[in-house]
């Protein structure tokens, strides 16, 4: 470094404003014996002693390209220099405002000022911007200015697109992407990522992404999907599989259907965490007419979707398992999934759960009257009162209500009436899973389990066997004048058998079952 350069640095460090500005300029440009180092140049030009001065702002505006100025958050300095009459600052500020959705009037003002200062490109940009439609405004203003005066048109269009994406401005995002593609920006990973993000934004806003070339859309999806972008893989998989993609024009996937390729992309998206893809995979592989039909794989995809919390998958899996159930464990697993779906508001799942519950004979008994009767029974026999409440909430027969173990039978979704050891006839004594059709029923089961759990030591001695319980219940009902129909369900062995075995239940509930699987 020359002696005069060392002296200039010393003056700058001693507080000379002019020296600071000159050192900063030389570092920004890498001239006059100084290496180019933007960070050091900024440090000199942004010294607190220079705050609010126009000279350092003009140096920044003239020395750095617009994209670098914006990346370094030098918008205020650019505005200060433009207001001071700096032609380069007026041009760059006008262009940057033109790249923003709400900056048209400011852009015309600053570009007009640059045009009056003698900048021919600014005059062309003003004329183009004044006549351009909003969708073409970005391209119109960039074309006469691109690749001149430190202006990289394609790069600026991409930066403006990112800003529009951050602000959720879909229309302006499309305009910026159109400009980037129109100015010859290569469809690299960065631009393809913005195109995919535009599709995602359109999907979130319930709109269709119009205005972009269909080839660019498809190429962007394929490029990003190949790089592991799950959103791109999900969209591409749906489109190639013939599933409607509302966020894209139909022309994008016209003549592009390929089930095997689409299923592969859907599987890639699902594996990356796009949970909705599992259900699409199930539908594709469950369709026997499809070239990728595979019932076993379809079931696997349905289970995956159910595990990820999708109500439709939980309902369909529960319905299929219940239809195939031949053991209590199968029924319990099926009811678990139906209960999960019903908890999310699935009406079909709720209907199927209700089909497993026997109706109480005296449905017209008022809740107030039932509550009063239960209180009377509770004073005489609290264990029986709990059993009666369970019976009415879950639709149990008299045998089931008097023999059920509320502690062992409690489940997160309802109640399991275990095998009745006091009855020899298999069809009457076999265990049965009964779902809670609402939160109130589940609360009754939990209260009963808590009561019997606390009093388990004395419950056996107090209640006796089934014969003793039945005798005590009958005598208490006679004394209190209660009707058994208000608490117990009346069902034949054949009806109970139909609720235990999947094939028989499926025939009994064929209408709601068909609706649940088709919905």
For each predicted feature, which ranges?
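Structural signature of tandem alpha-helical TPR/SEL1-like repeats
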Residues: 1-5, 34-43, 67-77, 102-110, ...
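TPR repeat positional signature
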Residues: 8, 20, 27, 57, ...
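Short helix-capping/linker turns of helical repeat alpha-solenoids
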Residues: 14-16, 30-31, 51-54, 67, ...
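Hydrophobic face of amphipathic alpha-helices that form TPR/SEL1-like repeat modules
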Residues: 22-29, 59-65, 92-97, 128-130, ...
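TPR/TPR-like (Sel1-like) alpha-helical repeat modules
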Residues: 43-49, 108-119, 147-148, 331-347
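Basic, Lys/Arg- and aromatic-enriched nucleic-acid-binding interface segment
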Residues: 358-394
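Conserved tyrosine-mediated DNA breakage-rejoining catalytic core shared by Y-recombinases
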Residues: 404-441
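Active-site/catalytic core of tyrosine-dependent DNA strand-transfer enzymes
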Residues: 434-519
């Amino acid at each position: 470094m020359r002696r005069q350069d060392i002296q200039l640095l010393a003056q700058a460090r001693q507080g000379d404003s002019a020296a600071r500005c000159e050192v900063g300029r030389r570092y920004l440009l890498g001239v006059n014996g100084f290496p180019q180092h933007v960070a050091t140049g900024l440090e000199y030009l942004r010294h607190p002693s220079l705050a609010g001065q126009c000279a350092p702002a003009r140096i920044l505006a003239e020395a750095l390209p617009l994209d670098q100025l914006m990346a370094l958050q030098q918008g205020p300095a650019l505005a200060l220099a433009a207001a001071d009459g700096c032609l380069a600052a007026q041009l760059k500020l006008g262009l940057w405002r033109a790249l923003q959705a709400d900056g048209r009037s400011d852009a015309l003002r600053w570009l007009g000022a640059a045009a009056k200062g003698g900048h021919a490109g600014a005059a062309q940009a003003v004329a183009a911007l004044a006549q351009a439609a909003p969708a073409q405004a970005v391209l119109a203003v960039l074309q006469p200015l691109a690749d001149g005066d430190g202006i990289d048109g394609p790069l600026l269009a991409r930066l403006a697109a990112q800003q529009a994406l951050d602000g959720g401005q879909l229309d302006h995002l499309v305009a910026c992407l159109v400009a980037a593609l129109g100015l010859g920006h290569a469809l690299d990973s960065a631009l393809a990522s913005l195109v995919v993000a535009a599709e995602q934004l359109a999907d979130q806003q319930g709109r269709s992404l119009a205005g972009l070339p269909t080839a660019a859309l498809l190429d962007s999806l394929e490029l990003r999907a190949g790089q592991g972008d799950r959103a791109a893989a999900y969209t591409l998989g749906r489109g190639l599989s013939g599933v409607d993609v509302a966020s894209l024009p139909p022309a994008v996937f016209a003549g592009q259907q390929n089930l095997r390729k689409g299923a592969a992309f859907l599987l890639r998206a699902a594996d990356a965490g796009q949970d909705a893809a599992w259900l699409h995979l199930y539908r594709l592989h469950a369709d026997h007419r499809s070239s990728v039909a595979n019932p076993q794989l379809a079931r696997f995809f349905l289970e995956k979707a159910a595990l990820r919390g999708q109500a439709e998958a939980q309902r369909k899996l529960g319905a299929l398992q219940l239809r195939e159930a031949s053991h209590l464990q199968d029924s319990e697993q099926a009811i678990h999934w139906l209960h999960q779906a019903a908890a999310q508001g699935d009406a079909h799942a709720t209907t199927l759960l209700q089909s497993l519950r026997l109706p109480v004979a005296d449905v017209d008994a008022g809740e107030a009257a039932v509550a009063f009767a239960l209180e009377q029974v509770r004073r005489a026999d609290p264990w029986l009162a709990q059993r009666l409440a369970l019976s009415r909430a879950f639709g149990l027969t008299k045998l089931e209500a008097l023999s059920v173990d509320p502690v062992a039978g409690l489940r997160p979704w309802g109640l399991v009436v275990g095998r009745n050891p006091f009855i020899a006839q298999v069809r009457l004594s076999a265990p049965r899973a009964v779902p809670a059709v609402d939160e109130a029923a589940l609360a009754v089961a939990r209260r009963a389990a808590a009561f019997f759990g606390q009093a388990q030591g004395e419950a056996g001695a107090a209640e006796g066997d089934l014969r003793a319980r039945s005798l005590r219940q009958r005598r208490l009902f006679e004394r209190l004048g209660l009707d058994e129909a208000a608490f117990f369900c009346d069902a034949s062995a054949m009806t109970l058998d139909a609720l235990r075995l999947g094939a028989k239940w499926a025939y009994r509930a064929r209408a709601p079952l068909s609706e649940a699987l088709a919905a």
